[in-house]
C-alpha cells in the first residue's frame, strides 16, 4: 500500500513538471506584441503599449449572429379610410366658405292672378295638343302615301330622300310613264317561292331586264308592309300565287317576252304574260264575273271558262290584308268571239254558287254615260225633235218668233175704252 502511494505521488509530480514545461515552451514560442521593442529599450515599455499576443492579430473574430430577414410591407392602391378622429380634425380645419342660402320669400298670389295663371296653362296645354294632333295626322298621311296599290304600280316611282332613309312617292312624267309601260310586261300566277333572280333568268333570253317588282302581296303579319313582306318573303299562309311587273331596257325585248305566255314556270303554275300598255283593248276582250265563292282560286275559274276560248289572264279581286276573295273577278280572252260564248255561261254554277257574267265596262266611260243622259248605252245619240212649220202654218217655234215693244200712248179725254158701254143715267 505504501508503494502504491509513493508511485501515485511520483506520477503527480511528473505531470506537474510536464505542465510547467509546456507553459514555458508556449511562452517562448508565442510572440508578444512589443517584445522586440522591450528588449531594445532595456525592458522599459511606454505607457499605453499593447500586451496582446501576435497570434491574436491573425485569429478570426467570433462569429456574429446571423441577420434576421424582415419582409417589406406591400403598398396597397386602396385608399385608407380616415379614422373618425381625422375626419373631425379635417372638418374643424376647413373654413366655412359657403354661406347658407337665404330663404326666398314667396309672394302670395291673389285670386285674380291664380285665375290668369290657370287660363295661361290651359291655353298652353291646348296648343300642345293641337301640335301633337297635327304630327299624328302627318304621320298617318306619310304612311298612307308610302303604301303602293296594284293600280298605282306603274304610276308612281319610289325615290330616296337626301338623307337616304325615308322613301317618298315622286310622280313620273306622263311621256316617260308611257314609254316605260311599252317596255313593261305583266306576269301573273307566279308561285310565292319565285324571286327576282329566278324571274330575271326566266326572261334573260329575250333581253336585259332593268327591274322586277312584285305585286298582289299579302303580308303574313298585319304590321308588315307589302314591300317588306316581298323582300323578307313572309307571305300569308293562304296565298298561293303573286303577280309581278318586269321592266326591260328595250321595247323589242318586252314584245319578245310575250312568247312566254302560258309557259309553266313551276308545277301547277302556268304564267300569264301581257304588255302593261295594252289596257284599252282589254275591256272588249274581258268579262266580269260576280257572285264568286270566296275561297275560289284562279285555276278553278280558268277551267270554268276554258271551253269558251283561249284565256289570256284571270284575275280575282282579293282583300289585301286577309287574301280572301271579294266575290268577283275578271277573265281576259284572246279575241272578242270568246266573250260572246262566255256571256252564255251567265247563271252557271261554280262550287255551288250561280255566277253573274257580263261584259267588262270601263269605269270612265260609264261615268261619262251617266253624266250625259242623251247618250244611249250603245253610244248613239237620241234624235232631237225640232218643230219646223210652213209660212202659212199658225204654229211657230219659240226661237222663230221675234216680237216688238209696244209704245205706250196717252189716253185722250173723249176716248172710250173698248168693251165699255154708256150706262143710262138714272132719272130723278
UniProtKB/Swiss-Prot annotation:
It comes from the Eukaryota. GO terms for cellular component: nucleolus. GO terms for molecular function: RNA binding. Keywords: Acetylation, Isopeptide bond, Nucleus, Phosphoprotein, Repeat, RNA-binding, Ubl conjugation. Residues 408-428 have a biased composition (Basic residues). There is a cross-link at residue 240 (Glycyl lysine isopeptide (Lys-Gly) (interchain with G-Cter in SUMO2)). The modification N6-acetyllysine is found at residue 147. PROSITE patterns: RRM. Residues 1-106, 127-152, 361-428 are annotated as: Disordered. CDD domains: RRM1_RBM34, RRM2_RBM34. Signal peptide: none annotated. Belongs to the RRM RBM34 family. PANTHER family: EUKARYOTIC TRANSLATION INITIATION FACTOR 4B/4H, RNA-BINDING PROTEIN 34. This is RNA-binding protein 34.
Amino acid at each position: 500500500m505504501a508503494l502504491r502511494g509513493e508511485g501515485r505521488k511520483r506520477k503527480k509530480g511528473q505531470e506537474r513538471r510536464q505542465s510547467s514545461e509546456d507553459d514555458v515552451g508556449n511562452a517562448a514560442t508565442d510572440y508578444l506584441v512589443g517584445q522586440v521593442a522591450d528588449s531594445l529599450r532595456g525592458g522599459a515599455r511606454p505607457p499605453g503599449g499593447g500586451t496582446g499576443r501576435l497570434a491574436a492579430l491573425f485569429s478570426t473574430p467570433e462569429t456574429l449572429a446571423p441577420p434576421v430577414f424582415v419582409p417589406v410591407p406591400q403598398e396597397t392602391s386602396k385608399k385608407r379610410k380616415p379614422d373618425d378622429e381625422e375626419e373631425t380634425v379635417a372638418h374643424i380645419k376647413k373654413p366655412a366658405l359657403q354661406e347658407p342660402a337665404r330663404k326666398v320669400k314667396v309672394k302670395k298670389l291673389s285670386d285674380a292672378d291664380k285665375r290668369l295663371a290657370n287660363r295661361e296653362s290651359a291655353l298652353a296645354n291646348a296648343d300642345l295638343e293641337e301640335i301633337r294632333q297635327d304630327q299624328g295626322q302627318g304621320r298617318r298621311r306619310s304612311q298612307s302615301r308610302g303604301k303602293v296599290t296594284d293600280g298605282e304600280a306603274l304610276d308612281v316611282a319610289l325615290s330616296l330622300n337626301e338623307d337616304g332613309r325615308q322613301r317618298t312617292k315622286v310622280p313620273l312624267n306622263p311621256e316617260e310613264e308611257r314609254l316605260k309601260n311599252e317596255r313593261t310586261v305583266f306576269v301573273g300566277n307566279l308561285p310565292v317561292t319565285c324571286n327576282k333572280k329566278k324571274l330575271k333568268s326566266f326572261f334573260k333570253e329575250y333581253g336585259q331586264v332593268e327591274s322586277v317588282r312584285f305585286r298582289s302581296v299579302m303580308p303574313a303579319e298585319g304590321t308588315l308592309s307589302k314591300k317588306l313582306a316581298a323582300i323578307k318573303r313572309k307571305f300569308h299562309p293562304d296565298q298561293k300565287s303573286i303577280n309581278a311587273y318586269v321592266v326591260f331596257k328595250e321595247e323589242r325585248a318586252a314584245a319578245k317576252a310575250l312568247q312566254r305566255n302560258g309557259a309553266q314556270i313551276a308545277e301547277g303554275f302556268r304564267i300569264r304574260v301581257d304588255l302593261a300598255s295594252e289596257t284599252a283593248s282589254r275591256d272588249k276582250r274581258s268579262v266580269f264575273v260576280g257572285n264568286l265563292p270566296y275561297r275560289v282560286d284562279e285555276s278553278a275559274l280558268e277551267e270554268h271558262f276554258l271551253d269558251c276560248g283561249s284565256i289570256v289572264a284571270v284575275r280575282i279581286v282579293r282583300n289585301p290584308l286577309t287574301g280572301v276573295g271579294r266575290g268577283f273577278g275578271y277573265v281576259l280572252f284572246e279575241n272578242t268571239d270568246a266573250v260572246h260564248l262566255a256571256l252564255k255561261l251567265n247563271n252557271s254554277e261554280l262550287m255551288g254558287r250561280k255566277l253573274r257574267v257580263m261584259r267588262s265596262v270601263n269605269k270612265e266611260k260609264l261615268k261619262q254615260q251617266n253624266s250625259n243622259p242623251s247618250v244611249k248605252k250603245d253610244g248613239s245619240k237620241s234624235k232631237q225633235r225640232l218643230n219646223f212649220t210652213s209660212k202659212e202654218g199658225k204654229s211657230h217655234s219659240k226661237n222663230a218668233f221675234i216680237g216688238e215693244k209696244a209704245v205706250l200712248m196717252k189716253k185722250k179725254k173723249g176716248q172710250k175704252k173698248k168693251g165699255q158701254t154708256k150706262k143710262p143715267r138714272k132719272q130723278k
